[in-house]
Structure formats: structure tokens, C-alpha cells
Amino acid sequence: MKKQSNAPQIRFQNFEDEWVNQRLGKTVEVIMGQSPDGKNYTDNPNDYILVQGNADMQNGRVVPRVWTTQITKLAEKGDLILSVRAPVGDIGTTDYPIVLGRGVAAIRGNDFLFYLLSRMKQTNYWAKFSTGSTFESINSNDIKSAEICLPSQDEEAAIGSLFRTLDDLLSSYKDNLTNYQSLKATMLSNMFPKVGQTVPEIRLDGFEGEWEKVKLKDVTESIEYGLNASAKEFDGENKYIRITDIDDVSRKFKEDSLTSPDINVSECDTYLLCEKDILFARTGASVGKTYLYDKKDGKVYFAGFLIRARIKDKFDSKFIFQNTLTDRFTQYVKVTSQRSGQPGVNGKEYGEYELYLPKYEEQQAIGTYFSNLDNLINSYQEKISQLEILKKKLLQDMFI
């Protein structure tokens, strides 16, 4: 098939007609918002839902937050809701009849148009209308005169259905991720002893007996500071981990911008991480952030604002690491890190952290339980990331 001048790069089979140029206002009805008087705002869910801007939308849906007794401009269930004030172009749909505030407009469109408007946001289409303005906004004429390209109704339906399926799958993955993250938070709270307790509230089957109180220094071979070297471009083998390279949520080594230590690494074996090593951030806003070395991360040297605790063989490093994610540890860091300048915890202070240990077999079981839970969480995070990349690519290539 010959290349067409007015067709997207990616199309479903059996669709060959060129797309038609059109103005948005000639295609659908656009309703600009008008805010009610502030005195008529309420928190009563029996009143009319008021949508004023993107703060009233989450994940592409209107989420009731404010109500009003005064009707100004109305949107119907199923309408598309476009943010017309900073940030301009955010788009959502409403599952309810709503009152439109002046920060939004309603568009009577379908799934295809929803994703077309999503692409326009992605490509900064609306930015040209706010150039030179101190307050980013678009008006009725900007919206109605927006230039769009439309396929046949059948192709619109096919494209809209594809993206709706993608979004439903994304929503499902995000729900699962949230559920597993909530489960982990609950288990961290209940599978380690709380303050004043010597056993946890929840234990795995087959284990009993008191846990022993120890200090972090009792379970480590050494507690050492990192390498005093700047970072350079990644050499393909020797990785350099700094505080910012530890993901705040997953506590995994982020490899999106790898670097190497700017030093002769043949003389730096002391700073090379190995299994059972746990890193602790020692200063700044990230103090207390931890990372458990994973051999899959390869050859990794650790930087000077990190402290390494090398766990003794007779203790389970996964169990010790999960201890550093508990409220007890967070509270210890909060109290200990108080300084006249920026917060910090040194190696000796980390070594004084008190924790409770069960027998080795139970340590292993708990460490494995949380490791498996982390793997589930990471798998959903990866699926979400991959789907979002795919969606962004398809938005770019399936529209004009």
C-alpha cells in the first residue's frame, strides 16, 4: 500500500482511507465552565458535584471532592472534562452529572476523542496558546478552533477500544500493586516486634519462642564508609552506587543513568559490594534509606555518603534489611539524625540500632516471605512501566 499523506504511522488492518482535517468545535459540543458563588460550596455528597480543575480528577476520572448547591454549567455522565487552566490540557471523564467550574470545560466526545486529547496534552499542543502569558490558560475559541484529524467512525471505535483496553489493564495492574504494597506495609508492622514487645503479632506457621534483642553491630562483620571519588561515565563494567541511585520506594539500584567511580578500581576492592551487604544513607534528606546488594546488579562500588554493613554469615541479610523498612527503624533514624546542620547518622550510631532476632530458620523464612512479596511488587511496577511506554508510543503513532 502506498504511503498516505494524511494517515497515522500505525493502523489496524482493513482501514485505508485518509483521515479528514477538522476543527474540534465543528465535531463536538464544547461547554465552558462557570464557577458557582463560593458561599454555595458544600461538603454534602447529596448536593451537586463541583469540578474546578485537575485536582478533581485522578487517573483520568472525576473524583468528587467539593459539592455545590448552585448550578451554573452542567456536564453529563460520560462527558470528557478538559482542564483549561494550569496545568492546561489534562483530560478525564466523569461517571456522574457535574457542575463545571471555570477551570474546566466539558466535551461531548467518545473514547477516540479522549485519547486524541490525551495525545494533544502529550505533545504540548495547548502550550502555544499560553506563550507569553503569566498564567497558563486556554479559552473557548482555542478549544473549538483546535485542529484535529478524524478517521471513519469504525476506525475511531477500534482505536478507542484498544486504548480503553490498555487503560483497563493498567488500572488492574495499579490496583494489584497498591494491594501488595498495602499488604507489605501491614506485614512489616505486624511481623516484627513493636516497641515494648519481644515477639511479633503475626508469625509464620511452625515458629515460636522469644526473640533476642541485639544491636546492628552485633550482627555485622564490619560497618564501613564508602569510596571518596567522583563519578564518571559508565565504563561498561564497574558500577557506582550513590544515595540518589537507590530508588526511594523499591530500594532497588536504579540503572537508568549508570556511572563508574573516577578512580583506579583495581586498588578499590575494599569498596566492592558482595552478598549480605546492606548500604545505609548517612546524611541529608535521604538519611536512613537502605539498599540490600543483589548479585544481579553486577560489579558495584559504593560511594562516600553511604555506609556498608556486612552481615555475618549466621544471620539472614534479607531479614536484617527488612528490619530497616519498619517504623521502629524509621523512628530511630529520625531521633538519631538530629544535627545542628543537615540530618545525619554515622556508622557508630547505625551500629547501636537495636533489633530483635528469632532463630536463624525463622529469619530465613521471614526474609524469603518479604523477598517474594518484593518480587511481586517489582513485577507489577515493571508491567505498569512497560504498558505506559507502549501506550505513549501508540498515542504518538496511531493519531495525527
Predicted ranges, named:
Residues 12-13, 159-171, 192, 204, ...:
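Hydrophobic structural patches
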Residues 1-16, 175-209, 382-400:
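Short amphipathic coiled-coil heptad-repeat segments
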Residues 22, 187, 198, 287, ...:
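Short, charge-patterned binding micro-sites
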Residues 11-34, 203-225:
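Non-catalytic DNA-recognition/assembly elements of restriction-modification systems
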Residues 9, 128, 145, 172, ...:
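The feature marks the first
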Residues 2, 25-150, 217-357:
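DNA target-recognition domains and sequence-specific DNA-contacting regions of bacterial/archaeal
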